Amino acid sequence: MSHGTYYECEPRGGQQPLEFSGGRAGPGELGDMCEHEASIDLSAYIESGEEQLLSDLFAMKPTPEARSLKGPGAPSFPHYLPADPRPFAYPSHTFGPDRKALGPGIYSNPGSYDPRAVAVKEEPRGPEGNRGTSRGSYNPLQYQVAHCGQTAVHLPPTLAAPGQPLRVLKAPVAAAAPPCSPLLKAPSPAGPSHKGKKAVNKDSLEYRLRRERNNIAVRKSRDKAKRRIMETQQKVLEYMAENERLRNRVDQLTQELDTLRNLFRQIPEAASLIKGVGGCS
């Protein structure tokens, strides 16, 4: 492939030829660098009329109508649309999902475009703006609290102001939403014995009478238990005495039996009678 088809443009007026610090590379070095490249001649697309067109574009000045739409420090742009002669009233809320606040006829007529009517959301600056944004943003914890607990969080439809706190309202337990987790179950109501219980003032007569009745009942139960214990101990003592008396009786009868046997052994007739009675029996 030939590498000699390079073109040099004629230097324009007021331009200095570029000079490189290094020496110009030889044909051999250029051939090594651009081995697989092709050069395109662009001189056919460049004419003298193009330079005049560019100079006319840069020399164009903005119209007085365009200047009226800009401030004193704004850059000059000649392609502004004419301003809307109708008076524009700024709405109180021009950002967020509520776009109807801008008015129904803003976008109906394409020729009545006013750059001031476009609502631009500004990012908060400083720590106060960050706190306001964080309050107005969606928080999954608030959703969980509103659906799983007895607390209802009411958020305003618009973004909350930096100094405006959120309102937290306590809802009754009966009207609260059912718990979404088995760990967050509502406490079961008390039994029927606790339903009729009411708070009584300790200085009232009813409270004193109730305490006195309770004390009397406690004393009666304690006395009854003591009586049962004493009765049991008395019965134990009685049984022990009866047992001792029976043992003494048994010993006495045993001694009498031994005495009678000795007497009958000393008398021979009595001994024969005893033997005869023993044989007949």
From Swiss-Prot:
> Region (Leucine-zipper): which ranges?
246-267
Q: GO CC terms for this protein?
A: nucleoplasm; nucleus; plasma membrane; RNA polymerase II transcription regulator complex
Pfam families cross-referenced by the UniProt entry: bZIP_2
One Gene Ontology MF term: DNA-binding transcription activator activity, RNA polymerase II-specific
Q: Where is this region: Basic motif?
A: 208-245
The Gene Ontology biological process terms listed for this entry are: cellular response to lipopolysaccharide; DNA-templated transcription; granulocyte differentiation; macrophage differentiation; phagocytosis; positive regulation of gene expression
Alphabetic keyword roster: Activator, DNA-binding, Isopeptide bond, Nucleus, Phosphoprotein, Transcription, Transcription regulation, Ubl conjugation
Residue ranges of the region described as Disordered: 1-30
Q: Could you list the residue ranges forming a coiled coil in this record? A: none
Q: Which residues carry this modification: Phosphoserine?
A: S181
Per the annotation, which location comes first and is thus the protein's main one? Answer: nucleus
Q: How does it get modified post-translation?
A: Phosphorylated.
Q: Which compartments is it annotated to reside in?
A: Nucleus
Cross-link Glycyl lysine isopeptide (Lys-Gly) (interchain with G-Cter in SUMO2): residue positions: K121
The bZIP domain covers which part of the protein? 204-267
Protein family = Belongs to the bZIP family. C/EBP subfamily.
Q: Which PANTHER family match?
A: CCAAT/ENHANCER BINDING PROTEIN, CCAAT_ENHANCER-BINDING PROTEIN EPSILON
Q: How does it assemble?
A: Binds DNA as a homodimer and as a heterodimer. Can form stable heterodimers with CEBPA, CEBPB and CEBPD. Interacts with GATA1 and SPI1. Interacts with SMARCD2.
Summarizing the function annotation, the protein's role is: Transcriptional activator. C/EBP are DNA-binding proteins that recognize two different motifs: the CCAAT homology common to many promoters and the enhanced core homology common to many enhancers. Required for the promyelocyte-myelocyte transition in myeloid differentiation.
**UniProt-recorded name of the protein:** CCAAT/enhancer-binding protein epsilon
UniProt source species: Mus musculus
Q: Which gene encodes it?
A: Cebpe
